[in-house]
Design a protein with these regions (language model features):
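Residue-level marker of intrinsically disordered, low-complexity segments enriched
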Residues: 2, 8-9, 126, 354
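Short hydrophobic/aromatic segments of transmembrane alpha-helices and their interfaces
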Residues: 2-3, 302
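Hydrophobic alpha-helical segments, especially transmembrane helices
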Residues: 3-4, 273
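Outer-membrane beta-barrel biogenesis signature
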Residues: 4-44, 175-177, 187-188, 278, ...
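Beta-barrel outer-membrane channel/assembly domains of diderm bacteria
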Residues: 16, 20-68, 73, 77-82
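Outer-membrane beta-barrel porins/channels
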Residues: 21-22, 52-60, 70-73, 79-358
Length: 358
């Protein structure tokens, strides 16, 4: 039960998870370290938000400014001994895809922005007495970005790779499929070279910090073939800003992107095994709306979500899991001078995971 149900839970948690606080597109889970034996997985997903707002007392609409996108991740885990497990994970920790439609009359019509990243995380778990274990690892993260505003401002960064770490601890009670893990992901600061076009092309440089975060993941059996599971994720988003010097000068010191509040995302749900081949999970997610306004390149604030997942044990060593997620995106008012009102927005996410034990 433990292996099948936790797999279903992970996909339910991650399908469309990118709509959580800030620009994150990965929950940075350490769950792969607890898979049995030698294990490999491939995950692919997509999220299709519908985000629009208005100005002029609702008379001018932005149109859908949040195009859909896809994500992927790869993972491999093996035991080096009865006390040591190692894993490597490739994922996309942060990302953004903004595209205000042209011809709407909205102040940012035709503006676009992208943020992309890739990361490789190598982790190790060392088992201690009494079902405790410690976790540690290193992360290499590559990031870049590009923006083009309707005002004529453009900016493109270099691709930069920098490094961070993950540390944590876990406790298990296999008899009831119980597990709790607490992990800390360090911040990673990227020093970008950039080309800005304010009044002509200008080479510049600036630093952006991908923020630190803390993950609490848990599960426990509550009845035969039934698990209660969930997570709490805190992200220090006030560490994150995009502040190219040319843009700062033209805007009077206002960053291109920043966040005035940190985020805490919650998930809670139930998983159940129906038979030796099929299991499923139902998960709920929540991130509260924060006070104040939001950036015009990210006009969302908090969310509520529901996810469904099903897992099929195709053979003794292959399992396939699919999940769908509906997200009710929180209302937001964007920063002055635009002051766009974004409400009644939502999105759908879906993901598929193939896991192989060998």
């Amino acid at each position: 039960m433990k292996r099948i149900m936790t797999t279903a839970a992970v996909v339910a948690l991650s399908a469309g998870m990118a709509q959580a606080g800030g620009v994150e597109r990965s929950t940075q889970s350490v769950g792969i370290l607890f898979e049995q034996g030698r294990y490999a997985e491939f995950n692919v997903g997509g999220f299709n938000p519908d985000v629009s707002g208005t100005v002029g007392a609702g008379t001018v609409s932005s149109g859908d400014m949040a195009p859909g996108y896809g994500t992927y991740s790869l993972g491999y885990k093996q035991a080096l001994s009865d006390k040591i497990d190692i894993a490597i994970v490739l994922d996309q920790p942060i990302g953004a895809n903004v595209g205000y439609p042209a011809g709407t009359g909205y102040p940012l019509q035709g503006s676009t922005a992208t943020v992309s990243s890739n990361a490789v995380t190598m982790m190790m778990r060392y088992k201690l007495p009494n079902n405790f274990s410690v976790i540690g690892g290193l992360r290499a993260e590559q990031a870049s970005g590009e923006v083009s505003l309707s005002s004529g401002y453009t900016m493109k960064t270099s691709d930069e790779t920098d490094y961070g770490y993950v540390i944590g601890a876990a406790w298990e009670k296999p008899e009831i499929a119980a597990r709790v893990s607490l992990t800390y992901n360090s911040k990673i600061t990227h020093d970008f070279s950039a080309s800005e076009n304010v009044m002509g092309g200008v080479p510049t440089s600036f630093a952006t910090t991908v923020p630190e975060s803390v993950n609490l993941e848990f599960q426990t059996g509550i009845a035969k073939d039934t698990l209660l599971m969930g997570s709490v994720r805190w992200v220090h988003w006030t560490q994150f800003d995009i502040s190219p010097p040319g843009y700062l000068g033209a805007s009077g010191g206002v960053p291109l992107v920043d966040y005035s509040n940190n985020s805490t995302s919650w998930t809670l749900g139930v998983g159940r095994r129906f038979n030796d081949q099929w299991s499923g999970a139902l998960m709920f997610g929540y991130e509260k709306t924060q006070p104040g306004t939001t950036g015009n390149l990210g006009p969302t604030d908090g969310y509520k979500s529901v996810s469904l997942a099903a897992s099929y044990q195709a053979s003794d060593n292959i399992k396939i899991t699919g999940g769908v997620r509906y997200v009710d995106i929180g209302d937001a008012i964007t920063n002055a001078p635009i002051g766009g009102v974004f409400s009644d927005n939502s999105g759908w996410g879906a993901g598929v995971r193939v896991g192989i034990n060998f």
